[in-house]
Amino acid sequence: MESQSQRGQHETPKRSRFTGMFHKLKTNLVFRSKLAEINGAMGDLGTYIPIVLALTLAKDLDLGTTLIFTGIYNAITGAVYGVPMPVQPMKSIAAVAISSTAEDFGIPEIMAAGICTGGILFVLGISGLMQLVFNIIPLSVVRGIQLSQGLAFAMSAVKYIRKEQNFSKSKSVGDRPWLGLDGLVLALVCVLFIVLVNGDGEEEEEEEEGDGSRGRGRWGSVRKVIANVPSALLIFLLGVVLAFIRKPSIVHDIKFGPSKMKIVRISRKAWRNGFLKGTVPQLPLSVLNSVVAVCKLSYDLFPEKEFSAASVSMTVGLMNMVGCWFGAMPTCHGAGGLAGQYKFGGRSGGCVALLGVAKLVLGLVLGGSLVGILEKFPVGVLGALLLFAGVELAMAARDMNTKGDAFVMLMCTSVSLGSNAAIGFVAGDLLYVVLWMRNYGRAKPSSLPPQSGEHA
């Protein structure tokens, strides 16, 4: 009897750990508001669709396999982190692939670059070095990277709206006509519709109606109804409908069933080119935007959610060390995607988990034939979604309200936009140290930002 009771006592912690884990997963996936979470899931598509489409058209990326794996990534990260953690393409690797010939940088090189980047990020995470990096980077430098990335997204969005795009060559091909199913008027209407529904993105508190405020209360009710309209979801569905109208024969091109998965064969030359041309430029961007900036922005938006930079680095690493072997696009998290999903209503892991299920279903049911629909999706509509994701990310820098903070941030932003995020990061850190040395010993030194680790 004693041995049985002792076994029961030993088993209790196991059950409690399992129960606690199940409760955490359930809590992470619970919708805060069903319609808002569904709407928020659309907030990342302005970045996701153009890059996936470009790689599919230019490099014959397996769209069906990419949808399946990114869908799984979305579902897992949503359950683990409990925030609308995005899954985005690795932009630097994609840019190199699109601008190179298939012989010079094709699918094997793309996957080699993704595996190498993922492997390094996983090692940085599991060793604790990523957490150390996160703790010592000045907050103003993080804000500078976020501001530069947000402005870069917004400028790309304006280009999508104003100019017609050839994604397979990653370039503009002329001015967008005012009228038409992918015209300038349509894009501008989408932008104004989002502003009307979502406003500036601030959470509005409900006002109590007092005596004599019936008119104001009536307008408040109308405004509340408008605010509950799923703007991003409606705009995305409009884009899908317009894609079929622009090319009705898409219906005949649809083939049911998933793509056949196969392991990508990577030669020694592909490993070398993938690492030198893909991993080397991608790694600084992944460390800064996919890990450091994401963790900082997540803390700003969801201070009650705790997860480390090390864990985020490891999830990015695992995603690519698994999926890239099967031809799935190299992916990472991104502060811009998180900002976009938050802008349109994403508040929980259920938001991206739902998006993941949708991707998984599309990948299994339609496979690569979905590319025909994406090819005719109005680019101006994507630009409208991407514009607000970029602006939302850039607005994270609004808390740099002293001259010392703003100076470091804006210098980092300027260098990042003029060159790249890695050089901007080095310039920002160097400037921070120089200013700290200059102000050392002053009775009232000019304000410099706290370390990002103080907020982790």
UniProtKB/Swiss-Prot annotation:
Keyword Nucleotide-binding found: no
GO cellular component, one term: mitochondrial membrane
TM region positions: 67-87, 110-130, 133-153, 177-197, 225-245, 309-329, 354-374, 377-397, 417-437
Main subcellular location: membrane
Pfam families: MFS_MOT1 (PF16983)
Gene Ontology MF term list: molybdate ion transmembrane transporter activity
Disruption phenotype: 90% and 80% reduction in molybdate content in shoots and roots respectively. Reduced growth of roots and shoots under conditions of limited molybdate supply. 9-fold reduction in molybdate content in leaf vacuoles. Decreased nitrate reductase activity due to a reduced molybdate uptake.
Family in the record: Belongs to the SLC26A/SulP transporter (TC 2.A.53) family.
Further comment found in the protein's record: The amino-acid substitution Asp-429 to Val observed in cv. Landsberg erecta may decrease the molybdate transport activity. A 54-bp deletion in the promoter of MOT1 is strongly associated with the decreased expression of the gene and the resulting low molybdate content observed in several cultivars.
Function text: High affinity molybdate transporter. Unable to transport sulfate.
Protein name: Molybdate transporter 1
